[in-house]
């Protein structure tokens, strides 16, 4: 039988499976968000606080998207994992394949991101 002793700090890191934080949009077309996540996330969810996840602008036939999902297997339009997976690259006013416009850095909007181990 082999015992392994770990510190309380190590145990807490192992038990941490979710990391949440917030960033505020500044309307830059491309922005990198350093998450300070204590682990390498395998998935991330970004959503706006106090804003509808997507807004349909009927007169202009545009769908404004304020949410994104990403994993080590791929991401939705407007979100990229940097090589370290702790830095998120988000886009503002990025055109999609139809009439959607990705808005992950809208000025004044608070975005919550959830990193999952």
Residue spans for each PLM region:
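Surface-exposed ligand/attachment interfaces on beta-rich extracellular proteins
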Residues: 19-39, 49-58
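Short, flexible beta-strand-to-coil junctions
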Residues: 45-53, 116-117
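Aromatic sugar-binding interfaces of carbohydrate-active proteins
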Residues: 41-43
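Short, surface-exposed beta-strand/strand-loop-strand elements in extracellular ectodomains
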Residues: 51-72
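Short, structured beta-strand segments at or near domain termini in extracellular proteins/domains
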Residues: 99-117
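Fibrous stalk/shaft segments of extracellular and virion attachment machinery
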Residues: 1-19
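Secondary-structure transition/turn motif
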Residues: 2, 91-98
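Short, exposed beta-strand/loop patches in secreted or surface proteins that constitute
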Residues: 71-92
